[in-house]
Regions:
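Short, ordered beta-strand-loop transition motifs
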Residues: 57-64, 133-135, 167-168
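Extended aliphatic helical segments
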Residues: 47, 65-67, 86-91, 108, ...
Length: 208
């Protein structure tokens, strides 16, 4: 086969191996995530941090395992959503180490947006560099389908699938390149949901 005129890394992350965290490990993740939530500088005064978080399937990339999370928090001005991720190093036959976390919040909620078909969050966690100035943002994406019948989620760049995962307990995690540079027009990720018949149910940009 001839050289690819547009060499883009595809399926750069390990697929989920453990699924949604639970039990004591979920508690360990929660301690780390709660601590970083308390450090959000512009979090309104009076917001009560939740005791539990909704975790999403883990993905591994760049020597770390990434676990997204979300939670609702009540404050004096109404309900907020906390979102972010915990990452750690997992060595075979050893306990996880080097826990790190990132968190932010939003007052834009899915239930207030009837037109949404996917409730999405994303965070750039790295950068890929190619030849001749080509580059892209390594992006962790997690979310929930807001339509019935979704069994899988995919990430696409210019109609080409670059990551995919089954939906587990109504949640999914993707990890792929976004915002490609120096390929002519900039190329951005599109997240799609699919049913068991491989029919597209929804398509959303990270920039909607």
């Amino acid at each position: 086969m001839p050289p690819d005129p547009r060499p883009i890394p595809r399926f750069i992350a390990d697929s989920t191996q453990e699924g949604i965290p639970h039990g004591r490990f979920a508690e360990r993740l929660g301690e780390t995530f709660r601590g970083i939530c308390a450090e959000i500088e512009d979090l309104p005064d009076g917001v009560e941090l939740p005791a539990e978080f909704d975790w999403y399937p883990e993905r591994a990339w760049g020597g770390r395992v990434w676990v997204p999370g979300t939670a609702r928090a009540d404050g004096p001005e109404g309900t907020l959503e906390l979102f972010g991720h915990v990452s750690y190093v997992q060595v075979t036959d050893s306990d996880p180490t080097d826990f790190r976390a990132h968190a932010d919040f939003t007052d834009v909620l899915a239930e207030d947006n009837a037109g949404w078909k996917i409730d999405l969050n994303d965070e750039v966690i790295g950068r890929w560099r190619g030849e001749n100035g080509r580059a892209g943002a390594v992006t962790l994406v997690w979310g929930r389908p807001l339509v019935q019948g979704a069994v899988a989620a995919t990430a696409e760049l210019d109609r080409e699938t670059v990551d995919q995962e089954e939906i587990s307990n109504g949640r999914f995690t993707l990890l792929a390149l976004d915002a490609l540079e120096a390929y002519g027009d900039d190329i951005y990720m599109q997240v799609k949901l699919w049913n068991r018949r491989a029919q597209e149910l929804a398509s959303e940009s990270l920039y909607a």
